[in-house]
Amino acid sequence: MKIEANDVHVYYGLDHTLKGVSLSVKKNTVTALIGPSGCGKSTFLRCMNRMNDLIDNCQVKGNILIDGVDINSPSVNTNELRKAVGMVFQKPNPFPKSIFENVAYGLRVNGVSNKEYINDKVEWSLKQAALWDEVKDKLKKSALALSGGQQQRLCIARALAVEPSILLMDEPASALDPISTSKIEELIYNLKASYTIMIVTHNMQQASRTSDKTAFFYMGELVEYDDTRTLFTNPKKKRTQNYITGRFG
């Protein structure tokens, strides 16, 4: 297994936000996390690269293994972890730099100075993110001039440039129009050949289109985790059925 979470609990102060979540994720698959707002799915996603460490009064208990390594071990370098486990946020967040420098940024921060290598890596990353053909003639222009959908794909390229093996996406298309959303979904499908992807989404159609497995969270608990087709067509739990049929959420 690429990822193994065992009895994961998260507390924000006295608030018990995530309650004993256990699930395993295979390499080169897409896993969707669904559930109503505040159910714990984004909190669980942030556990994968220890982004919760940056939140005051947040405490994480349980084990999370990535490639067999306990990522909560004191010996784990969080900078290296976040390089290996990239993250794309809900709202596109390009830096106020050129398109080229947005992608090159992570390489430079990690000590890469070889100009030819950086040039090649920027092109490779933009191609991986299905953006190269749209920006190859304007790499020196500001990333802020791109459309919202292009900015989000640029953020994906920026994450890919440092060669992660896992890509976390927290509602990556929720702020985008339908055409841009379709491009992001197609990109997710293509990227899973090279990466293990975990995506938080409120859009159940998106979860069913893009993912191999789906986890349904409710009030901090993992209610059901199954193959996506099975979960959406023949859920085992009544709460899952009620949610996917729109009876609450």
UniProtKB/Swiss-Prot annotation:
Q: Under the GO molecular function aspect, what terms does this record hold?
A: ATP binding; ATP hydrolysis activity; ATPase-coupled phosphate ion transmembrane transporter activity
Q: Where in the cell is it found?
A: Cell inner membrane
Does the entry feature the keyword Mitochondrion, yes or no? Answer: no
User: Membrane topology for this entry?
Assistant: Peripheral membrane protein
Q: Which residues does the annotation say bind ATP?
A: 35-42
Mind telling me which residue stretches traverse the membrane in this protein?
none
Q: Which keywords appear in this protein's UniProt record, sorted alphabetically?
A: ATP-binding, Cell inner membrane, Cell membrane, Membrane, Nucleotide-binding, Phosphate transport, Translocase, Transport
Q: Which reaction does it catalyse?
A: phosphate(out) + ATP + H2O = ADP + 2 phosphate(in) + H(+)
CDD domains for this protein = ABC_PstB_phosphate_transporter (cd03260)
Q: Name one GO biological process term.
A: phosphate ion transmembrane transport
In this chain the ABC transporter domain maps to 3-244
Which Pfam families does this one have? Answer: ABC_tran
EC id: 7.3.2.1
State the Gene3D superfamilies in the record. P-loop containing nucleotide triphosphate hydrolases (3.40.50.300)
Q: What does the subunit section of this Swiss-Prot or TrEMBL entry state?
A: The complex is composed of two ATP-binding proteins (PstB), two transmembrane proteins (PstC and PstA) and a solute-binding protein (PstS).
Function, in words: Part of the ABC transporter complex PstSACB involved in phosphate import. Responsible for energy coupling to the transport system.
PANTHER family assigned: ABC TRANSPORTER I FAMILY MEMBER 17 (PTHR43423:SF1)
The family line of this record is:
Belongs to the ABC transporter superfamily. Phosphate importer (TC 3.A.1.7) family.
User: What is this protein called in UniProt?
Assistant: Phosphate import ATP-binding protein PstB
Organism field: Cytophaga hutchinsonii (strain ATCC 33406 / DSM 1761 / CIP 103989 / NBRC 15051 / NCIMB 9469 / D465)
